[in-house]
Amino acid sequence: EILAMFENGNAVYNDFTKALLSHRMEDLNDILLDIAYTSMSYFDVGNEKEARTPENFYHGLILGLIVTLRDRYRIVSNRESGRGRYDIAMYPLEKNQDAFLMEFKVWDKKKEKNLEETVESAFRQIEEKKYVTDLVTAGINEERIYKLGFAFAGKEVLVKEKI
């Protein structure tokens, strides 16, 4: 029974990383929603924009899910780049591979109507703060840098991607 739990956990890691690397956002969203509904409490993720607690929780979750890619990516968290600090960047060890830049946002119901607007806020922050600067300086072609906006509201999650 314990081995089955670990095997199922490995399946989640593998499914998540495969969806990420193949740019299957619908699958990525489904996996995160499944994790949220089956494994998390509102105590974990918060139901309001309480300081940075929900954002930090999801940040740690995503780091945990992608850590298995260390043999293919240099995974960096909270590094300064451009005019700010991105949440997570994945620098490919082979320059011809895709890079990923992730920004996490908690839905602010006073400023945003829905999670779609929260994702757009994440994309605006990536652009305005020029978070791609460090990746480009590292020699990664900007056309290979995929930006992911993550929006959270309690157990609700939305992830979108753009180049």
Predicted regions and their residues:
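Nucleic-acid nuclease catalytic cores
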Residues: 119, 130-161
